[in-house]
């Protein structure tokens, strides 16, 4: 943000001496926003006390407050905003009893944050960057021409300080507002998924795509102009290297370079973080869908029931008792009804026992990676394991390998938010998507 010429103790003493304080409950803030909105509709930029009372009446009605004491409460609210330096009051003998009010810079700043700054516009950003590029080019040309100290102050330092730096601060503020909007979108998505994830999928997709598009649009605009801006800053910096009396210009250029680097780098980092969050939400939705194994049958059954009178149907089933006992926990006890008695010399192993044996074997073989600190490429390891088993067991073995591998450690590349490449793990089209595990 903007640099401060005063030290921290000086600023603290100044604020204490002037008794600065801001207290804006929701009704006071709403009143201030109403004043700013109505004030924006007037060419002269000023409002009478009667107009302020009318604005307060709208706020009072919205908060369902009594109308009997509205004049007194409006007067208190106006005086409160004047006391907090959010409104300026002007009186004269001609307009005695009917003062004129104007918003202060502080009042404009607060209302501008809540009203205008939340409206992201790529056109607005492009215009700001165009103005910055023009100012920087003019300053760079003046710096290469050279001149006395007055020339440097007027044609180089002043445009950089009071035009370029302020626009950089405005862009930085836009990014911080985008950060806040991302948090609000995340809260909205969390509420949607907590209510009904099926109905929320389309809404979540819309919120995710809109935010991703806005971030990408912002970053593309910054990337397109960033190199030209840095080039002009370097031109000014090169022109000051031969002068010992231009430290103030050199320091300002360095600050602007740091701001520009921070703006561009944070824009890219925000996109990477949002990509990671996007993947997290989609993974949650996919997991929820995978848990609903019968979703297709259930959906068709609901549709069939709803359209029964238009398209009647009949359900035919066999072995009614068996159908009713499908979820019977003791069903395994009746296996002999199907298989009959087994010969004494025939050994039978349950799938769970085989799975436990495989898991123990795979766990022992994978432990070597953790003990020696060797990076574990899940694609190569899974392919080696699957080559030892018949095709019918590939799915179960691959699942065990993945389960055991993720228990050993994590991949630091997962924290970048970038997707891993798909790697084939057998000759039948099976693939796995995972980063190399390198932190145990």
From Swiss-Prot:
Q: Name one GO cellular component term.
A: cytoplasm
Database matches in Gene3D superfamilies: Chromosome partition protein MukF, middle domain, MukF, C-terminal domain, Winged helix-like DNA-binding domain superfamily/Winged helix DNA-binding domain
Which cell locations does it reside in? Answer: Cytoplasm, Nucleoid
* CDD domains, per database record: MukF_C, MukF_N
Can you tell which superkingdom this protein's organism belongs to? Bacteria
Record keywords, A-Z: Calcium, Cell cycle, Cell division, Chromosome partition, Cytoplasm, DNA condensation
What does the record list as coiled-coil region(s)?
none
Main location, first listed in the record = cytoplasm
Q: What are the recorded Gene Ontology BP terms?
A: cell division; chromosome condensation; chromosome segregation; DNA replication
Q: What one GO molecular function would you report for this record?
A: calcium ion binding
User: Which Cys residues form disulphide pairs?
Assistant: none
- Keyword Cell division listed: yes
Residue ranges, annotated region (Leucine-zipper): 208-236
The subunit field of the Swiss-Prot or TrEMBL record says: Interacts, and probably forms a ternary complex, with MukE and MukB via its C-terminal region. The complex formation is stimulated by calcium or magnesium. It is required for an interaction between MukE and MukB.
What job does the chain carry out?
Involved in chromosome condensation, segregation and cell cycle progression. May participate in facilitating chromosome segregation by condensation DNA from both sides of a centrally located replisome during cell division. Not required for mini-F plasmid partitioning. Probably acts via its interaction with MukB and MukE. Overexpression results in anucleate cells. It has a calcium binding activity.
**Which protein family is named in the record?**
Belongs to the MukF family.
Q: What is this protein called?
A: Chromosome partition protein MukF
Organism from which the protein derives: Klebsiella pneumoniae (strain 342)
Q: Its encoding gene is what?
A: mukF
